[in-house]
Amino acid sequence: MAKLALNAEIYCDDNWTDGVPRNGKEIFFTVDGEKLNAWQTCIKYCNKLAEVGYRLEDDYSYNFSVHNENSNENIFTIPLDKNLYAAQFWYLFRSRHYNHGGALGGSSENGTSANISTVLANGYSTDDVDARFEKNFYAGIVEVDGKPVMMDNGQQLEYFPLELKLNLTGSSYVKTAGARMAKYEVDRTSHSDGRQPDNDIVLFRYADALLMKSEAKVRNGEDGSLELNEVRGRVGMPYREATLENILKERLLELVWEGWRRQDMVRFGVYHKSYDQRVQLADEKNGYTTVFPIPQKSIDLNPKLKQNVGYK
């Protein structure tokens, strides 16, 4: 419910291309018999999470450990157990170099890497690198159990976070470009070449709720610094003022690899704009990419459906 309220401006807008966004202060919910606007509703439900005992774990990485089912922070997860379920978790498998995966007792596809804007937001290669960067990414020279991981050409494996790969040519450059996912602890006893670990997949956790509460407070004209800096303080990062810009950045730093970025960027009104290497499409200024196109097959089956504005 907290997520629904936080995104109410987007969900209640039936014309996202007219340049007139909805106002969360004028969207109302009834909660426990009380009429609250969207931001107050989000805050109310975030408070309810604290009331039932959810809290930040002292160790950020514990939420992604092999036995993270005992986390007091994780609210909604997809349970994984290699001995009980056939479900697989491909994020780590797809990200690492295949020799890196092999050194960990499994395999990998050498694919997914962080984009450069994410790496720069973490302060990589500066004196102000975020404390979560090394917890979330493999970067630089790779070692496993204190031993270097070697590439097929005899060179030591090293990931280059500021290198960009667009075409998967199979070259050494492509195999080492980009920071790779390291957020989840590696289950060295996993099945299916590392695709069936015991780590539960985290979908929603209390740190997210705190950042949601901070954002809702700011949008409602209140101070959200307490919640923002509770999240930052857990990893030893200094105080930061709770502005919408800072909250959006904090959500990137804290929740990277957790699947919220597109929703966040749409809510903050920046998804369709130019940033870093992302160039705005010529006809995108009206924000039509806020929503996806309706598949043509669905329109063919139901003539009453009309394609979303901006798509042909």
Feature locations, PLM:
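Acidic helix/loop microenvironments that form the catalytic cleft of cell-wall polysaccharide enzymes
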Residues: 1-9, 230-236
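C-terminal substrate/ligand-recognition segments
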Residues: 131-231
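An aromatic- and glycine-enriched ligand-binding surface/loop that stacks and positions planar moieties
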Residues: 3-166
